[in-house]
Amino acid sequence: MDVDQLILFVFVCCLSSRFADAYDPVDPNGNIIINWDFQSIENVYTVMVSVHNHQLYRHIEQPGWRLSWRWAGNEIIWGMTGAEATEQGDCHRIRGATRPHCCEKQPVIVDLPPGTPYNNQVSSCCRGGVLSSLTQNNRTSTAAFQMVVGGFRRATYHDGDRGPALPSRFGVGVPGYSCSNATKVNATSSERFLLPRARAPCAVTWQVTCTYSQFMEAASPTCCVSLSSFYNSTIVPCPRCSCGCPRSPTAPQCISEGEKPELPAGDGEAVAPVFRCTDHMCPVRVHWHVKISYREYWRVKVTITNYNQVKNYSDWNLVVQHPNLRSLTQLFSFNYQPLIEYGTLNDTGMFWGIQYYNEMMLQDGNVQTEMILKKDKSDFTFSGGWAFPRRVYFDGHECVMPPPDQYPLLPNGGPDSRVSAAQLIASSCLLLPFIFLIM
């Protein structure tokens, strides 16, 4: 293999790993869909743009989505309801008494804040760009806005129809997401996004699909897991340098216990992340504690700690994979919904806070719950680390787990009583010949 072939091979491997990382086994069909539903197409066109979060557990938090695209020609946004462009652009070439809303070749559109006047709203708008996950609240997992566009040229679509030329280079302005090109699909109805005074049918629909990759969002993880149990005094901490090393040049600023972070001078000034100094340097830690074993049940305590000193996590969620979740009997202080159910398989569930109680995890704070699970006689055991989760995700990010060989062991390093009994019988059988020889 020559040098050129080797370089090509390495490039293909890296490219393949990047696309493989975009696949999510917990939510394989999760994505964000952007629809452009055209209500009229004449000299100008009126279109309802809707953003649908079809992800089971990933949500879009503040500062929210920032939808962008590149026009095919010299399009002009004359008016917009339910959102606004961040820049008006150069509109000097436009003559007339009416000023356009935006003349940018590549506009960036943001949602309006809550409390926007009624006459500048459409349904599902004005939440500051925040989108809930489907599991937490499917009613707030969609955003929409309406705009009037002129100066467009017509083009022929793949099905032979003619209409406005398709834009390109779509983005949602949220780290980790990449978007496809727009395609013409079967017309959908946009009536549910309109206020009663402005209902209209949909003539043509464009659609864009955006997918998430944790590899694209961050170079390092953002959460880690620690473990403990009632049967072992050892507390297994998050692996060292899980999200970065304390004294690394690329590590965010950290402060010791009792110190206060420096706040920005102005309200609009961006706040750099400031963490509490730890060996793992993760902004979030999830601690799983096996608390009590009853005759037919066992109890687990989960604590989520926010080490970020300048950020609150609103509408947070936690996804856990464990085979005994199918037998979850009682849960305290959190909401819960199974995510993966195939026949008898039900090993992945999502936890999130209760509204007005703990749906927001405050900076340098924590939230916690306890759950009671029924022991399944077919596979329940405390040996081999079975009682600890297989995977943990916080706010859509997979957390770093400790190595399995560091999990808390049963007393004397032994397995559970059933295995110990088997070992005792086997040992006795091996000793029998020696006993007979002695006799």
UniProtKB/Swiss-Prot annotation:
Secretion signal, residue range per the UniProt entry: 1-22
One of the GO biological process terms: plant-type cell wall cellulose biosynthetic process
Main location per the UniProt record: membrane
Membrane topology field: Lipid-anchor; GPI-anchor
Cellular component terms (Gene Ontology): plasma membrane; side of membrane
Glycosylation sites: 138, 181, 186, 232, 312, 346
InterPro entries cross-referenced by the UniProt entry: COB_C (IPR056900), COBRA_pln (IPR006918)
Family of this protein: Belongs to the COBRA family.
UniProt protein name: COBRA-like protein 7
Species the sequence originates in: Oryza sativa subsp. japonica
Native organism taxonomy: Eukaryota, Viridiplantae, Streptophyta, Embryophyta, Tracheophyta
Gene that produces this protein: BC1LP1
